[in-house]
């Protein structure tokens, strides 16, 4: 049927030892470890897989639930998922490390496996204004920008969007 696989390299999983040692993606060390992992799977599957995604729904890291799902910044936590402690600083530091890891892996793949096509994906969440009041419209735009465009701008354009400095 001429179906070709599309592999998502990281789909909400992180070895528990790395969560405990580095607090997941908050630890810069995870960048090199991800690169090493990707080099192994690229070599192993170079003749079977052409299409790759580096991270599943990377923008989930902008949310509190992203501590568990995407960035794995939950070192030492053993309670309910609904009560995960939240640190916006840790989440966005972890996201930055994922962006760097993704960029490095894409660069490596293009240099060593020109047949590969690498991309990214987000969990696009539409936000509608509650009313037609200007403040509700602006809030909906703000939610769309921070939830959807922030991560996709970095991954597609290779740089943080202009509003990121205001957000940080």
Where are the language model's segments positioned?
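Non-catalytic scaffold segments within catalytic domains of secreted glycoside hydrolases
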Residues: 1-168
């Amino acid at each position: 049927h001429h179906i070709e696989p599309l592999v998502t390299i990281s789909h909400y999983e992180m070895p528990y030892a790395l969560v405990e040692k580095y607090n997941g993606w908050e630890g810069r060390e995870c960048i090199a470890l991800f690169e090493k992992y990707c080099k192994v799977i690229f070599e192993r599957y170079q003749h079977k897989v052409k299409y790759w995604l580096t991270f599943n729904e990377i923008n989930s890291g902008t949310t509190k639930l992203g501590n568990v799902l995407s960035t794995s910044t939950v070192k030492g936590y053993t309670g309910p998922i609904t009560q995960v402690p939240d640190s916006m600083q840790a989440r966005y530091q972890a996201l930055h490390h994922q962006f760097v890891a993704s960029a490095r892996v894409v660069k490596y793949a293009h240099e060593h496996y020109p047949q590969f096509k690498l991309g990214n994906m987000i969990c696009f969440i539409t936000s509608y204004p509650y009313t037609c009041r200007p403040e509700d419209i602006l809030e909906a735009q703000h939610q769309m920008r921070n939830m959807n465009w922030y991560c996709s701008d970095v991954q597609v354009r290779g740089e943080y969007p202009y509003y990121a400095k205001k957000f940080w």
